[in-house]
């Protein structure tokens, strides 16, 4: 069955018969193949192998070449008419037709009837001469076939913009290797070109990478944009799409494709008209090709115009959609803005004429093309009809094109592609809004998006080369970087560019890596800058993706565009090198190692041994690299140079010898990276605790201020017309009460009193960080109780005891002799600026003088204190060897000071009255002017003699702190019930009618550290006591007062420190040990509640802290009321005129809040009967009790302080180093013989300050020192303050001016004692003493 099927198929197979001419040409080809068999060099090839190579050898190569050449040839084929693009690129085997010579040929009937013309000019005859220069020994030996193959491959390489491969030349040349000998003579050639020399240092061959070539890679980062982000909104998506469309629109307008196509179309039409005018029979194909090119250009022009018009329409639609979205959502979070430039045609008739002319030209051209197509089809149909003999049916003739349909079709295409003559010209451009004028707003809500910071790291082939700055993410989810990074490349060029995207945390110094962006670098010095848009997506999340816009360029370092471009050097293959280079000569026969004739040893030939090669850098090395890195002096110098180690950062001298370097503290490894802040190693733990606590409180204030400002802006609405009163609140604009108050305010007028603080919804004020010049004025009137010099008093006491009389009869004479030996003067200083008053005399001096101090600084830098210091001018008579030479030496001894925080003065503008100077506990060389030391009369009869030094003054600053924006605490969320808030609003309206001054009103709802508002009474809650003040301890009240007074105060001009600011709870305060002055009163009042005392919190104004809190408590033994200042720990009686509390606003208890409605402003004249309704206004009633508890942490656990021995040594060294540095012109001598005695005195000072209740017992210590060391003239004092950092200690010592003693024999001694409380609250005690030996 299968055999029958095969025979049937064999019978049906039709063979192709060849003609006689074909067989003749085939025989000639076979004969040529046989003739060239012996000429093929190398291994013999049989006919079968040649046939396989002919039919199948080029299929793989042609396929690869076609894959790479499709894109290159496509555009050139289209420009040439599109004919080449339609031709298939097949291998020779695919174009071969198998012809059987035995079968007769089948010919078409029409083939013999057509007339054929032969044009000899169209025949291709390959040339037998080389078309390029080939460096060979003898070109005449090349055969014609080799020359034709070389020309063919040369043309193929030119079409691919490449070079002819050297390996192919070696295969086709077939030259014998040249025979020549290597000569030792060198000849100098002449070359007119001067080459630039390159320094090439010696190096091993394994490290050789090529000639040193210095190139510069300029990488510019333009923009970072997020397309996917957790904060992405619909407006972001539309704005990014619109921006991408506008970029495409701008690129099209910049390239002007339609204009260029229009010009090319006009040129093609002119060429076609000329060809048609002078066309002959031999130029028909050229005319057809030109007409075809014209048609393709017109179609491409229509397509580009339509695409550009559609893009413009889409751009306008998207822009309208974005504007509608912004209008509906009532906020804008992107900056993208577009503008339209509409230009109407100036002359409609000219526009119509141009449009009509263009349309008629295209219509005629299209109609001619349709006619040509019609006539071609008609001719083919006619020929087919005339020659068709076997066809049974006749096909219909082609129909002539209808002009109306063609015109309608072209008109429809014109409407889609081009604009109407009456349509105006529309151009879209982008509006670049300035940062200052950009009006961006974000949607309101409780949870606002946090600020995110990002930066980029650049890597070239895995090597880090640069990093961008840190930028904050804008509301439009874009970051404008605009940074350029230059990389100097030597020898090797990078291949890949990697960019890592990092997110920087706002609270910690760590950063989080988000995404990696990789792209290959196309580096070519001949091209322009390469612009790229790189997309990325986060590694850990799919909700973060975006694009990075950048461009880079590669140029020589000698100049941009000035260097000559060198050709690429192609390395010859090994096969060609063996062919072109001569073979090596045969080696000479080696001589025998043993000589033929034996000779004595002295006659043997000595082999010359060459010295070993040593590089120059090795000869210049003093020692090995490992030895250098292990050297301790090099480690010190390297660590000091890096400025990273705090131990070596301030070294001024490094010993030259290694044995002179002490090994007390190990140095870090210089080859590793050292962290700047490492707790316990480079910073003292207490310093680190203080530093972190200060940063925590500053960050807390910044976060709450930012949150309140955003909430206030989001909730800002137009104020109602009922709010006519200037001091009214926003919540009072509702109800009948507000309507009645509005009518009253219209008829009665407004009060002229200014509010104490601006309202929470006031407009935007000027920035507080502008540079300003301040003038501080101090009018000092008089002082009482100034200490006097003790040696005069001792002499007077001896005189009194020797006389044995009663000095009460001559009290005036006694006071004149005792208290006139001191010459005090007052100084006003801030930082390094100082001004002083004139010198007065006596213990009760009077100056009545005004001092002015100019301060030039910014608000952010005003953190120091204004110091009002009291000095004694001591004049000593100095005698020389000659009796006629007498001169004086003036020495200033510090007696005390009064510190005014600059932020309080800026907020209050003025301070006046009587203040108490902070005097040292022990003042050696001086004594208090107590009346009981010279007479037996009671002290009550002489009120001018007190234990404290008082100063009457008036202090002011111009300009004040009016530019500080208030904290919008009213916009924060409230934790109280709405009913309570409404009740407080009603009570506030009643209270404002009774207050004598509107400044007395304090908002009862305050902001806590959690960012929410609560009632003031919730802050009053018993909290755990410090460990030293447990009820079983001795006098726990005094210990609590002392502990609170040692907490650190934050000195900054910040509205968060006021009554409408942030109130801290006990956990935030005690963990950070930093707070404002008002927070100290809350903590002390809670301590008293834990002790079971009856106490209240007083809110008012004091000198020098401004708005602060005092504590009013009742002593259990005597039921007497006392006022306690939490900042200083001093207690005052209610009638004490020297109490620093100036005004009282309200009294806060655990059960109620009482507002002061008394007309009397003096505290000493204020009635403190809280049940008297005529003096105090209770905020809560029985039916509406005050809310309690919920803020303080009732189970707070205190932490134990760190070891203080190391810190005490650091403080002592710091003081000695600073005093020695300040005395640059004098030698500083330290006498350590006094130090044990001073330490013993300081150990008793803490208990004396805690339990003495403000009394001064320093005569005991000062007189003991003077008696123990009678051969020295002593002057010294003690300083006590809370520890913050070492810089604050240096500033206090510099203010005392103890280092200004210019006596040649003066000696100094310093003693330091630290008393630790819980949570690293330290009390620092310093004893500074200067002594001058007395000459007998």
Swiss-Prot record:
Localisation: Cytoplasm, Cytoskeleton, Cilium basal body; Cytoplasm, Cytoskeleton, Microtubule organizing center, Centrosome, Centriole
Domain of life: Eukaryota
Residues forming coiled coils: 136-156
Main localization, broad class: cytoplasm
Taxonomic lineage from the root: Eukaryota, Metazoa, Ecdysozoa, Arthropoda, Hexapoda
CDD domains from the UniProt entry: C2 (cd00030)
Protein name: Coiled-coil and C2 domain-containing protein 2A
SMART domains: C2
Keywords assigned by UniProt, alphabetized: Cell projection, Cilium biogenesis/degradation, Coiled coil, Cytoplasm, Cytoskeleton
């Amino acid at each position: 069955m299968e055999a029958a099927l095969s025979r049937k198929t064999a019978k049906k197979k039709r063979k192709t018969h060849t003609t006689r001419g074909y067989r003749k040409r085939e025989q000639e080809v076979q004969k040529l193949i046989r003739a060239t068999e012996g000429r093929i060099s190398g291994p013999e090839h049989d006919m079968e192998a040649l046939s396989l190579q002919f039919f199948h050898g080029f299929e793989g190569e042609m396929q690869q070449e076609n894959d790479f050449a499709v894109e290159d040839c496509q555009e050139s084929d289209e420009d040439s008419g599109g004919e080449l693009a339609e031709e298939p690129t097949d291998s020779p085997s695919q174009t071969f037709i198998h012809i059987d010579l035995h079968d007769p040929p089948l010919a078409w009937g029409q083939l013999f009837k057509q007339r054929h013309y032969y044009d000899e000019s169209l025949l291709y005859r390959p040339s037998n001469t080389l078309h390029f220069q080939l460096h060979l020994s003898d070109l005449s030996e090349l055969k014609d076939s080799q020359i034709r193959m070389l020309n063919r491959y040369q043309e193929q390489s030119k079409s691919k913009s490449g070079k002819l491969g050297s390996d192919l030349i070696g295969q086709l040349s077939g030259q014998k290797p040249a025979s020549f000998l290597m000569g030792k003579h060198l000849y100098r050639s002449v070359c007119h070109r001067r080459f630039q020399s390159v320094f090439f240092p010696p190096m091993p061959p394994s490290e050789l990478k090529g000639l040193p070539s210095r190139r510069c890679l300029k990488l510019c980062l333009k923009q970072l944009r997020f397309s996917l982000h957790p904060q992405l909104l619909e407006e972001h998506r539309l704005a990014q799409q619109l921006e991408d469309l506008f970029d495409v629109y701008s690129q099209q307008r910049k390239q002007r494709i339609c204009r260029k196509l229009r010009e090319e179309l006009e040129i093609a039409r002119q060429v076609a008209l000329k060809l048609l005018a002078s066309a002959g029979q031999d130029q028909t194909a050229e005319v057809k090709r030109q007409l075809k090119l014209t048609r393709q250009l017109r179609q491409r022009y229509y397509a580009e115009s339509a695409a550009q018009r559609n893009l413009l329409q889409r751009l306008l639609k998207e822009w309208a959609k974005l504007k509608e979205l912004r209008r509906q959502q009532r906020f804008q979070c992107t900056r993208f803005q577009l503008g339209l430039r509409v230009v109407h045609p100036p002359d409609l008739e000219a526009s119509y004429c141009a449009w009509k002319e263009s349309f008629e030209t295209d219509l005629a051209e299209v109609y001619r093309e349709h006619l040509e197509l019609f006539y071609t089809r008609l001719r083919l149909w006619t020929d087919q009809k005339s020659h068709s003999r076997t066809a049974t049916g006749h096909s219909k003739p082609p129909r002539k094109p209808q002009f109306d349909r063609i015109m309608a079709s072209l008109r429809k295409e014109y409407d889609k592609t081009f604009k109407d003559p009456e349509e105006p010209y529309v151009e879209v451009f982008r509006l670049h809004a300035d940062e200052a004028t950009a009006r961006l707003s974000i949607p309101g809500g409780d949870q606002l998006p946090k600020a995110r910071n990002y930066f980029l790291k650049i890597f070239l082939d895995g090597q880090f080369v640069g990093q961008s700055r840190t930028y904050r993410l804008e509301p439009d989810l874009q970051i404008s970087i605009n940074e350029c990074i230059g990389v100097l490349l030597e020898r090797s060029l990078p291949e890949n560019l990697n960019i890592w995207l990092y997110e920087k945390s706002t609270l910690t110094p760590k950063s989080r890596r988000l995404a990696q962006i990789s792209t290959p670098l196309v580096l070519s010095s001949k091209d322009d800058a390469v612009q790229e848009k790189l997309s990325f997506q986060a590694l850990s999340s799919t909700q973060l993706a975006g694009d990075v816009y950048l461009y880079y360029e590669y140029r020589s370092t000698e100049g941009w565009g000035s260097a000559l471009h060198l050709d690429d050097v192609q390395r010859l293959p090994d096969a060609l090198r063996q062919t072109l280079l001569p073979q090596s000569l045969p080696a000479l026969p080696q001589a025998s190692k043993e000589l033929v004739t034996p000779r004595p040893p002295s006659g043997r030939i000595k082999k010359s041994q060459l010295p070993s090669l040593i590089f120059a850098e090795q000869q210049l090395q003093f020692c090995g690299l490992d030895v250098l890195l292990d050297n301790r002096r090099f480690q010190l110098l390297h660590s000091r140079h890096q400025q990273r180690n705090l131990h070596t950062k301030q070294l001024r001298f490094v010993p030259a010898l290694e044995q002179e370097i002490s090994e007390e503290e190990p140095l870090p490894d210089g080859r590793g990276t050292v962290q700047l802040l490492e707790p316990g190693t480079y910073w003292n733990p207490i310093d680190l605790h203080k530093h972190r606590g200060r940063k925590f409180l500053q960050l807390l204030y910044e976060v709450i201020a930012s949150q309140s400002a955003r909430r206030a802006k989001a909730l800002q609405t137009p104020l109602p017309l009922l709010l006519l009163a200037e001091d009214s609140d926003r919540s009072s604009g509702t109800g009948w009460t507000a309507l009645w108050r509005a009518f009253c305010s219209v008829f009665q007028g407004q009060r002229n009193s200014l509010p104490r603080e601006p309202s929470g919804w006031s407009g935007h004020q000027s920035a507080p960080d502008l540079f300003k010049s301040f003038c501080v004025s101090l009018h000092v009137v008089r002082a009482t109780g100034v200490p006097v010099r003790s040696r005069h008093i001792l002499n007077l006491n001896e005189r009194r005891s020797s006389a044995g009389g009663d000095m009460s009869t001559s009290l005036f004479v006694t006071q004149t002799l005792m208290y006139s030996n001191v010459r005090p003067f007052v100084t006003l200083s801030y930082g390094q600026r100082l001004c002083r008053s004139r010198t007065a005399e006596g213990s009760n001096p009077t100056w009545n003088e005004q001092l002015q101090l100019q301060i030039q600084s910014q608000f952010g830098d005003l953190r120091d204190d204004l110091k009002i210091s009291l000095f004694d001018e001591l004049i000593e008579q100095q005698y020389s060897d000659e009796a006629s030479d007498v001169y004086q030496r003036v020495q200033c001894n510090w007696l005390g000071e009064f510190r005014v925080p600059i932020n309080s003065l800026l907020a209050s503008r003025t301070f006046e009255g009587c203040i108490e100077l902070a005097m040292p506990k022990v003042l050696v060389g001086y004594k208090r002017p107590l009346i009981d030391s010279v007479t037996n009369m009671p002290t009550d009869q002489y009120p001018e003699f007190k234990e404290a030094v008082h100063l009457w003054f008036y202090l002011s600053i111009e300009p004040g702190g009016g530019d500080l924006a208030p904290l919008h605490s009213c916009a924060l969320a409230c934790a109280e019930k709405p009913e309570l808030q409404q009740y407080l609003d009603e009570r506030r309206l009643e209270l404002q009618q009774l207050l004598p001054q509107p400044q007395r009103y304090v908002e009862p709802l305050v902001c806590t550290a959690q960012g929410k508002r609560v009632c003031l009474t919730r802050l009053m809650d018993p909290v755990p006591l410090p460990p030293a003040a447990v009820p079983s301890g001795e006098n726990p009240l005094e210990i609590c007062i002392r502990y609170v007074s040692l907490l650190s105060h934050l000195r900054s001009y910040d509205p968060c420190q006021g009554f409408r600011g942030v109130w801290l709870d006990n956990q935030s305060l005690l963990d950070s040990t930093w707070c404002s002055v008002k927070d100290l009163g809350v903590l002390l009042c809670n301590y008293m509640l834990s002790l079971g005392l009856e106490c209240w919190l007083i809110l008012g104004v004091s000198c020098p802290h401004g708005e602060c809190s005092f504590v009013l408590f009742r002593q259990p033994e005597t039921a007497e009321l006392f006022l306690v200042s939490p900042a200083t720990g001093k207690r005052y009686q209610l009638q004490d005129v020297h109490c620093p509390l100036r005004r009282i606003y309200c009294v806060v208890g655990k059960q109620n809040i009482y507002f002061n409605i008394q007309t009397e402003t003096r505290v000493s004249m204020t009635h403190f009967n809280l049940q008297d309704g005529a003096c105090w206004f209770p905020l809560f009633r029985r039916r509406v009790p005050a809310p309690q508890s919920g803020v303080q942490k009732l189970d707070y656990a205190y932490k134990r302080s760190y070891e203080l021995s190391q810190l005490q040594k650091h403080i002592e060294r710091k003081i000695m180093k600073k005093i020695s540095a300040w005395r640059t012109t004098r030698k500083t001598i330290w006498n350590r013989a006094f130090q044990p005695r001073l330490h013993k005195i300081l150990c008793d000072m803490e208990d004396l300050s805690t339990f003495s209740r403000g009394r001064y017992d320093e005569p005991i210590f000062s007189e003991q020192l003077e008696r123990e060391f009678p051969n020295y003239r002593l002057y010294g004092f003690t300083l006590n303050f809370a520890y913050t950092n070492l810089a604050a200690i240096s500033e206090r010592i510099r203010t005392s001016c103890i280092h200004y003693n210019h006596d040649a024999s003066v000696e100094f001694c310093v003693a330091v004692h630290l008393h630790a409380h819980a949570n690293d609250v330290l009390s620092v005690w310093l004893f500074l003493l200067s002594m001058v030996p007395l000459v007998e």
